[in-house]
Regions:
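Surface-exposed, charged secondary-structure patches
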Residues: 41-46, 51-103
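Short, low-complexity N-terminal intrinsically disordered segments enriched in polar/charged residues
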Residues: 1-38, 54, 58
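Short, hydrophobic secondary-structure boundary micro-motifs
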Residues: 33, 43-45, 123
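Short beta-strand edge/turn micro-motifs at domain boundaries
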Residues: 91, 106-129
Length: 129
């Protein structure tokens, strides 16, 4: 029998994702970077090209900064979130709407997080638009 997840950890993981969304919205790259493990990677599945592009954290942050430079707003709005905890690991599925100026794109984030030194950090993020 699998033990029930710690409800406190569930809220911490949800809080980490909420902070991610907030930092992305206000272009706070220091706070965004702090949410990720230094060796984290970000994978973007290109539906039209049927390929996966993997970016370093620095490359991902560069993409976010370029969107903020190009548009008055660049915001990922979380919609439905599903969290699964397995001891010190978490998996999060987040449906979102990404707003860039007048444009809106819908997609899904898949996050993997690990509990390190008393906090949850993102170790991998995959997404498609």
């Amino acid at each position: 029998m699998v033990a029930s997840p710690d409800p406190g950890h569930l809220e911490e993981v949800r809080g980490t994702i909420a902070t991610y969304l907030s930092a992305l919205k206000v272009n706070d790259m220091a706070r965004l970077r702090d949410l990720f493990d230094v060796k984290a990677n970000v994978a973007h599945y290109h539906v039209k090209k049927d390929t996966v592009a993997t970016n370093t954290l620095d490359e991902f942050i560069g993409v976010i900064q370029s969107l903020h430079a190009k548009f008055d707003n660049a915001e990922e709005i979380g919609e439905a979130m599903n969290v699964r905890l397995v001891k010190h690991l978490a998996s999060v599925e987040l449906d979102f709407c990404f707003v860039m100026g007048p444009n809106q794109l819908r997609g899904t984030d898949l996050f993997n997080l690990a509990r390190q030194n008393g906090k949850w950090v993102i170790i991998h993020k995959s997404y498609w638009l």
